Amino acid sequence: KNTLRPLMSGGGQEMNLRSGTLSPALCVGLGEACKDLTDNREKYTKHFEEIKSSLLSDLENSNLEYVINGNIEQRIPNNLNIAIKGKVAEQLFNFMPHIALSSGSACTSGTIEISHVLSAMKLDDDRIDGSFRISAGRKTTKEEIKELIKSLNNE
């Protein structure tokens, strides 16, 4: 049996593992965000599917040689990971400071190591180097997707 030591000492909340009072404002904010998602899930999913469709169409009509990493259907609707042949993702980002992209998974954002997820998929190093994640938000527009494709084409 392993005994866990408290992160902080104090009032004994969280079974004596982490003392401290939760922020009421943050708790209310989380509740409102959950309510918003519950109330608007279909609307948001439709929006993300439209954005993904626009992105795929614009990629197909571009001069870019690209490949989608992972299954196109079995993924969350607002997320796509692609590799562009002959490009290094980190170098692309230097020319597009106005566009937020990531070459790692969301949980390793900011690290300089290659993606453990793409490595586990047995992708070659060149493909991993050219891979990046595109995540859309509720306010992402089709015009922003077109701007992304233009930037990737160095236009």
Regions found by a protein language model. Give the residues of each.
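Pyridoxal 5′-phosphate
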Residues: 1-155
